[in-house]
């Protein structure tokens, strides 16, 4: 859903060398946050991520629904912040908190969460486990109110359209038997999903994933870029001085 992570769940991944990222994903209508039987509209997610420090990132996501473009335009937009509270160490998991900016009258893409992860090297490859908790509450903007702060209202996620997604405990596993790809399994509090991914030099990623062992598939592509355009060797030398 435009957030760094596995397939449909956020993770703790943090790109130290590539502070700018772009992502494109296609989610089938029956598993998108907006899908219902009357709409049947595949959702396209576009997102841009920017890291401003070693502990903070901002993410802009757009959910575009092609069949409704003439009525709603580009689509729903959401700004999220990620904060790295703990960096992974030998005996310490990584810990990240994600917060969505409130203010939407239809907060389908509003998700606050806490997630931790730990990686394990094995003789058969690299295994990483994620465990997180999605807030059951969202802040919604009531229409017809002139004052922004007076218009904010706290709702239960189950009362809005995306109610079962990232509502409570979620988690997942990724397994890399080789350096250029691997397999994924996750539970997003709504569905079980599984898939695979390929990567090229930590810069380009391609994912394909399946929902609930059904005929519905999603895909995503992402790319990472350094804000400092100097060669990596020069950037490393600068950090070491």
Predicted regions and their residues:
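Transmembrane beta-barrel domains of Gram-negative outer membranes and organellar outer membranes
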Residues: 1-111, 117-127, 135-140, 149-157, ...
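Outer-membrane beta-barrel transmembrane domain signature
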Residues: 37-40, 113, 117-193, 199, ...
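Residue-level recognition of beta-strand termini and adjacent short loop/turns
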Residues: 53, 57, 176-178, 201
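Predominantly the C-terminal beta-signal and adjacent terminal strand-loop region
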Residues: 192-234
